[in-house]
Amino acid sequence: MTDNKSIITSLSQVLPDIPVAEIAAKLESPKSSDLGDVAFPTFTLAKLLRQAPQQIASDIVNRIDQSNFEKVVATGPYVNFFLDKKMTSQATLKTILTQGAAFGDNNDGDGANVTIDMSSPNIAKPMSMGHLRSTVIGNALANITAKNGYHPIKINHLGDWGTQFGKLIYAYKTWGTEAEVKADPIATLLRYYVEFHEKAKIDDSLNDAGRAWFKKLEDGDEEAHQLWTWFRAESLKEFTEIYDRLEISFDSFNGEAFYNDKMDKVVDMLAEKSLLVESQGAQIVDLSDINPNLTPAMIKRTDGATLYMTRDLAAAVYRKETYNFAKSLYVVGGEQREHFVQMKAVLSLMGFDWADDVEHIAFGLITFNGKKMSTRKGDVVLLKDVLNDAHDLALKQIQEKNPDLADKATVAEQVGAGAVVFHDLMNDRTNNFDFNLEEVVRFEGDTGPYVQYTNARAKSILRKANTAVSVDELNLDDTATWDIITTLNQFPTIVQRAWQQREASIIAKYALSLSRAFNKYYANSKILLPDDQLNARLALVKAVTIILSESLRLLGVKAPEEM
């Protein structure tokens, strides 16, 4: 048993009313090693136990079984655990080497389904850096979800319906050509889309024409549908190339169009419950009874065309009926917050008790030199261009550091793409951040390549040793390894916390912390010294490679064997 498990077990014995998962999630590292190895804060227990946090901490220390620890002390509102170094080192290394990548797995989810609405680019537009966050956050959350015992279902809710397709069809019919589109489909369609908006600024009647074409598409017009199908097929080809580079797959590509024949059911349900109200010719749901600050949810426009809300309601109902999800996550930018608050409110009014299981996983913006990207204006940074540039930067550094490395191009792709993904996930999900590719692909500092390089370095030590590592000789007495041991020991708690907070940055920051601890040890230790501690040191190195590789996997980043 690793000592975090010992701590959780010991705490749960004196706090039987607190769920084990909640206890595990509260564990943290003290600000100073003088305060112990693991801290348990008691602030949030004050209301439940009706005691001051300091008193709760003191009572826990007086009642807890301390036999598995060096000592347990109360420091203000914290219970601080000082671990038995020898016992903890042995237990941690043996467990990691025995379990391998399964270390940190738990069954909190008991196999329940979690749908994850993610990526969801718009058809007929290239994937830009604006799509990166939803794509990689969703993928990492899916991996973290599975690690916590749930069954993730990744849904790419393609933006393949809406008035923009009416605008695009109008633009193509008015000034586009088939030859142009076939020569360079996505770039040409984007140019048409931007040109439409520029012309519509001068002549507003273009917007009416675009809406009219979309209404024809909704009504099943053959020409409109053929063009839409063509635009969709060309877009999916390019999207698939990007997803393949990021090694991201999906369980469903059911986009907005998939729900065309499923919206009437939702509208009928709203009507049956007398929730639909006519307002200036449109049909809305008044949400003021749930929250007086909420604006009404628009269900149908004055021309009878459906809106995003109608589709999202139909999608939510379909997903519950199809997957019976325990949680339904929507990885969508923070600017859509009100939309999801409205959607959950409508679902509640419809009588669905699972409305609270719908979660908006909001995230902040990526800017380039402080500027937000916009497809309508055309100042868009293409994701494939960023990945290409990241590959080239990674390859340049690899050629400088290790010119004899085999298959440099493959490693450069893993490092370049990994750098872009890691940088995104390293940032707290709801934060905005500016993107600088040169900093992102550096092999030093808080970067993905730094973690990958640390992992490759550790693997190279094991190759040099060229000996099997035994799990029976793990008597480390080197105090320099303690920082690594305690960091390794945190991994199961980190995995749980990342799921509970829906926050992949917890894993990324953990990987950086473990990398720093290992590199400090590497710089000051003779790991391959042939003495009676050699096996134990190699076991430590192997444990580091197991956990770094698994941390990178959870983030959706490759772990090259060599760099």
From Swiss-Prot:
A motif ('HIGH' region) lies at residues 121-131. Its main location: cytoplasm. Keywords: Aminoacyl-tRNA synthetase, ATP-binding, Cytoplasm, Ligase, Nucleotide-binding, Protein biosynthesis. One of its GO terms (biological process) is arginyl-tRNA aminoacylation. GO terms for cellular component: cytoplasm. InterPro entries: Arg-tRNA-ligase (IPR001278), Arg-tRNA-synth_N (IPR005148), Arg-tRNA-synth_N_sf (IPR036695), ArgRS_core (IPR035684), DALR_anticod-bd (IPR008909), Rossmann-like_a/b/a_fold (IPR014729), tRNAsynth_Ia_anticodon-bd (IPR009080). The keyword Glycoprotein does not apply. It comes from the Bacteria. CDD domains: Anticodon_Ia_Arg, ArgRS_core. Gene3D superfamilies: Arginyl tRNA synthetase N-terminal domain, HUPs, Isoleucyl-tRNA Synthetase, Domain 1. It is found in: Cytoplasm. It catalyses: tRNA(Arg) + L-arginine + ATP = L-arginyl-tRNA(Arg) + AMP + diphosphate. Pfam families: Arg_tRNA_synt_N, DALR_1, tRNA-synt_1d. One of its GO terms (molecular function) is ATP binding. Its EC number is 6.1.1.19. NCBIfam families: argS (TIGR00456). PANTHER family: ARGININE--TRNA LIGASE, CYTOPLASMIC, ARGINYL-TRNA SYNTHETASE. Belongs to the class-I aminoacyl-tRNA synthetase family. Monomer. This is Arginine--tRNA ligase. The gene is argS.
